[in-house]
Amino acid sequence: DSRTVGIDTELEQILSFADLYSICGIAKQPFNTVYQMIALLKEHPEYRNDAADFLMMPEYLSYLLTGKRAHEWTNCTTGALCDAHATCWSEIIRSAAELPDSWFTAPLVPPGTALGCLSDTVAAAVGYQAQVILPATHDTGSAYMAIPARDSGAAFLSSGTWSLLGTELTQPITTEAAMKSGFTNEGGYGSTTRFLKNIMGMWMLQCIHKEIDGVYSFAEMAQLAQTSAYPCWIDAADNRFLAPESMLEEVKASLREA
């Protein structure tokens, strides 16, 4: 998504990243919600007055089911808009990003909140009535709940398009050292914090698999990698691999430079 290119620099003219991180504890990523919102308003300034609220995808689906709006805490923390220490929206960040108050009118609620029953229209369509309860709507938040290890020293690795490596804490860590090391603080169930690093997962392979139109399966690609004697390495954490026009060409360019 090229819309957010340079948006971080614009925000830092008003609020330094060090100050932003000390509040929200979220590592800088070009896809963070705060950057997307600023980019959206630059492209569509009319949304500032026309939009009644904003909902992330899980909460929007819940709204379609019930007709009731809410912002779920674990999901909202990932967008660099929340105060990680006070478990609320950050007025400082919202003001610096010049985001309208009307977008934040729905309540900010913890996972496990009963949102309400299915709307009459939905209940009639599915043939039954049910109560909708918000889980930890951020996927990593719910994935973590399935991990059997629960002792304080346990580390976890949640792998998919991205890999999340970290541990669960009772309080966020928003120090300069944590910021410089690229750690992020995501809200978790039961007022916990997932202190983790977002590292490259299957994203590069997914892009390459799509580009070659599935000529090789993922298993075959892994086998080719294991048997390769190619002498060079690439840095999978390089931002050049986040959204290139061609992942294959970007990898080739990186190897040539190496």
Describe each model-derived feature in a short phrase.
Residues 1-14:
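Short alpha-helix plus adjacent loop in nuclease-associated cores
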Residues 12-25, 35-70, 81-96, 120-258:
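Active-site core segments that coordinate phosphate-bearing ligands/cofactors
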Residues 1, 71-76:
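Nucleotide/phosphate-binding loop and acidic/charged catalytic motifs
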